[in-house]
Amino acid sequence: MNVDHEVNLLVGEIRRLGSKGNDGKFSVKFGVLFSDDKCANLFEALVGTLKAAKKRKIITYQGELLLQGVHDNVDIVLLQD
């Protein structure tokens, strides 16, 4: 699977699992994304896909590396609709 395809899938999953904030942008907690069965089956390396999407300025989140448990409450925000 190529990175662009995985990033597009990630955008769809953020929309599916997240909610739209007052700013009109979708966001989801990292823990929700990480724990979802569909996401677990879609992404071999979720953190790598998140980093690629952040580098492309499609999403944003605080920090550089997200770890299960430690960063479960970090918001992943979709910048592009």
Swiss-Prot record:
Listed Pfam families: Costars
Matching InterPro entries: Costars, Costars_dom, Costars_sf
Gene Ontology process terms (BP): regulation of actin filament-based process
UniProt feature coiled coil, ranges: none
Top-rank lineage group of the source organism: Eukaryota
Stated family: Belongs to the costars family.
Protein name: Costars family protein ABRACL
Biological source species: Xenopus laevis
UniProt lineage: Eukaryota, Metazoa, Chordata, Craniata, Vertebrata
